[in-house]
């Protein structure tokens, strides 16, 4: 947000103080305390371009040219003497387009101009080509303001019953939800830490991040632009009905429109921004007027940006189908319960479904529990969760439960797993039990080290790199002769396992396993779906020594091997 302090500034010296009132119970997790975003002082002439007053869109893109529309807002006493000049530069600093447009007697507070870039380079996932537009506001022959806007040339399209298209290419969202806290580094913006997080997620095969459940820092969005990572930019975790005592519900009536408008205006030029989210699991899902609030917020966004879809993280399928909140949204976003996708598709008009929040599988890095069984809300005396990736929460599921829906239902456009990294707060299933204080949901732990689950997702999502990962570790003194299952996460279709040189058999991913035609409400109780995506030896017994796995390609050729001791 910004605050115009002009009426309060006096001649000569001034003291500007930023004071914060961090109350308890402001959030359901740890959002940070104190001043954790950067603050800037911006000076403007009386004739100027307002904050976030330049909007750039690329409504037409071909191989030969890109049409660029620049809308420049301005504040001036004499509008007929105003002109806006925009020069576009490529990433080599070369000028590629220019326009100068004068205001007319009929101009209100905005000048619109069209430019064309020949042979445009597109911004894309992992290939983030960026242009810069320098816009100057003239009053007569005098430059009164100058704004530099970084943007990308790219297109987004939703096709009902088909999917999501980026630059004319169909894609699936392979996304993660991320809180903004940086674990032991704290919540203050740290560009190096954010860059590392994005880089690790890209290595896992992630192409999109949902900024749950807060508006992201400008540095975060800029890094996503520069690194080629898509963003689903989220606004609120709470509307007018409270979840916590001192949450956003206290401010929603007076501030929601302004805050949401500022969010969209701030980031509408950023090519990494794929979609907007108006909320997450809000209590209004279960009231009759909930759809009206959703429409109100969606309309606010559409006043500022018509180029991106608007979604909402909804976790109560029955309620949002009944009160029409789901039907109201441009893009349906469902949190968990993928077994409800088919019903939602039958009843709703959008004919596309996004897994806006999925999985919530829990695990602790390097911790393995026996026997290896699928469990919900499992608790142990050491306050840990098993890294065999077979445990989840009462409302959630395992990764493969989402993958099989994403692959077998053509109207799904992808998912955002909960979460990419562990974070402070929400230590489900232990909740407030001491000393548990951080989540178990992440594919990467609080220290920034990958869990086994990182490699499970990598084996499925990263098509460019080889993945061959063995779990668990093989130091089990005292478990000699006991059943100790071995899992292999790999992008290859099959592998053979050896313990101390003796073959334990070959496993192949079972592609015959399909999503059931008639699904039951709830999750499976077994690990049948996992056989389509993981290689599992459930009966191996521990003996000290060496575990070796040999992976085979589609032709049955041995192409990779790995050992642990």
Residue ranges and their predicted role:
Residues 7-10, 15-79, 150-155, 163, ...:
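Non-catalytic, glycine-rich low-complexity segments
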Residues 5, 72-75, 409-565:
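Carbohydrate-binding surfaces of carbohydrate-active enzymes
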Residues 29, 42, 46-61, 67-69, ...:
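Active-site-adjacent substrate/metal-binding segments within catalytic domains
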Residues 10-11, 71-159, 537-545, 553-554, ...:
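Extended acidic/polar, glycine-enriched regions
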